[in-house]
Amino acid sequence: MEYIRLNNGIEMPALGYGVFKVDPKECERCVSDALCTGYRLIDTAQFYANEEAVGNAIRKSGIDRKDIFLVTKIWLTNSGDRKSQESFEESLRKLQTDYVDLLLVHQPFGDYYGTYRTMEKALAEGKTRAIGVSNFYADRFHDLACHVDVVPAIDQLETNVFSQQTRMRKLLSETGTKVMAWGPMAQGKDNFFGHETLVAIGRKYGKTASQVGLRFLVQQGIPAIPKTTNIERMKENFDIFDFTLDNQDMEALLSLNMHDSGTRDYTDLSYASRIIAQTF
């Protein structure tokens, strides 16, 4: 495993397992499989409605809590000082732990300033080791970073070979904030798994397109959280630490950046309205 140092000095694994849209009934088994495979970063969220299953899997694994990097996120319907604090305490209860390693604001809507104050308090109290945001683009990230006491350690964004977030990464570098990649395999879009460049580079190293895409991110210091419910896929995704992409291959992959800031427009009112209306 390789590690990435955050702007507060703590280290996180460069590769993790994400549980977005993993059925709570199946999630415990999936997280158990991931931990058995070797994953030590687990990414969940209140909105995923599977924190309890994640907590069960971690408790039953027998792995020391300090050896697992646990991430969760506060949903926008729980935004604001009071509701975010209450919901975070509930998340800790479900996860069966007295702290998480990284706590994020899930969406750039609602009273996320109140939520962030709750997170700063949780950081001071040792209930999280780092704090950050998710899906915050340039304007909202910059405004937030200018008006908080603790700048975000992470901004979790849709990031992959086709959406490389070069503009956001430049902005985030000013505060030492790291991009964390959700959708690191583009959710299979744009022929990711069969893309001729990914496949050709993979053939050179004896790797799959998925492994090349993940290695591309990790090699740039971008932690990634691929999701699968298949243990063989988990093993495949995890097997990216025995090769290094050369400069020529990195240049070829950099040229695949088709929609730099991702496939979702958070400034589009219809899309924003759909996000704001979502509950769990």
Where are these regions (language model features)?
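Short, acidic/polar
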Residues: D23-A34, G80-K94, F141
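Acidic-and-aromatic substrate-binding clefts and catalytic sites of carbohydrate-active enzymes
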Residues: V22-K25, A45-A53, T77-R82, P108-Y113, ...
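Acidic (Asp/Glu)-rich catalytic clusters
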Residues: N7, G55-R65, E89-Q96, K121-L123, ...
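Glycine/small-residue-rich loop that forms an oxyanion/phosphate-binding "nest" at active or ligand-binding sites
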Residues: T77-Y116
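N-terminal binding-site loop/beta-alpha segment at the start of enzyme catalytic domains
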Residues: M1-I68, M185-A186, F280
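Beta/alpha (TIM)-barrel catalytic core signal, keyed to glycine-rich beta->alpha loops juxtaposed to Asp/Glu
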Residues: Y3, Q107-F280
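A structural motif
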Residues: Y39, T97-V100, T128, P152
